Amino acid sequence: MKNIHCINHPLIEHKLGILRAKETKPFQFRMLIDEISSFLLFEASKDFSLKEIEISTPIQKTTVKKLDEKIMICPILRAALGMLESVFKMIPDASVGFLGFVRNEETLKADFYFQKLPKDAKKRTAIVIDPMFATGGTAIEACNFLKSQGVKKIKFISILAAPQGLKKFSQMHDDVEVFVACIDEGLNEKGYIIPGLGDAGDRVFNTL
């Protein structure tokens, strides 16, 4: 699966260990989600195009480089809201396109209930964020929708992923690069990532 990138880094592994622990408090959990998301964004943005512009330093004029892509961050509600601020800090000029999915606990499929994209979405590079990449259903439907709206370039960032979901996704969207901090063992009978970290949304918003 050439489109799947698992980012190996000692600091990511250290932070993941704390993130997984059930004793980790909500404010710590949010901070760790934010920090790990920043690492993943660095990797996902390596091929972003740049343009040269002329500026004046306090000493003289010089040529510098500036991002030459219009970015749209697409958080999948609600858990991905915990990742949004870290991406905004790195790309403050980005627009946000919200995608709402709710998991059907009987079928384990993702039901699409809300979307709000910028008017120029088709001209933007989409960075879809969702902390958990489990069955792949939500990721597939999110990319299906974005492509139906004319979005040409999509990247996906997740904290944890299950191999089953990544394989299924790659079969449907091999043109979408996925960046994850860790690929876990798999899924349990309820479709949750194991060993995982629990319900990311509940832990971010302290609704356990």
Curated annotation (Swiss-Prot):
Enzyme superclass (EC): transferase
Transmembrane regions listed in the UniProt entry: none
Residues holding 5-phospho-alpha-D-ribose 1-diphosphate: R78, R103, D130, P131, M132, F133, A134, T135, G136, G137, T138, D199
EC number(s) reported in the record: 2.4.2.9
Xref: Pfam families: UPRTase
Reactions mediated catalytically: UMP + diphosphate = 5-phospho-alpha-D-ribose 1-diphosphate + uracil
Gene Ontology biological process: UMP salvage; uracil salvage
CDD domains membership: PRTases_typeI (cd06223)
Annotated control of activity: Allosterically activated by GTP.
Keywords for the protein's UniProt record, in alphabetical order: Allosteric enzyme, Glycosyltransferase, GTP-binding, Magnesium, Nucleotide-binding, Transferase
Cofactor binding remark: Binds 1 Mg(2+) ion per subunit. The magnesium is bound as Mg-PRPP.
One term of GO molecular function: GTP binding
Gene3D superfamilies: 3.40.50.2020
Pathway(s) this gene product operates in, as recorded in its UniProt entry: Pyrimidine metabolism; UMP biosynthesis via salvage pathway; UMP from uracil: step 1/1
Family: Belongs to the UPRTase family.
UniProt function note: Catalyzes the conversion of uracil and 5-phospho-alpha-D-ribose 1-diphosphate (PRPP) to UMP and diphosphate.
Name the record gives this protein: Uracil phosphoribosyltransferase
Organism listed in the record: Campylobacter jejuni subsp. jejuni serotype O:23/36 (strain 81-176)
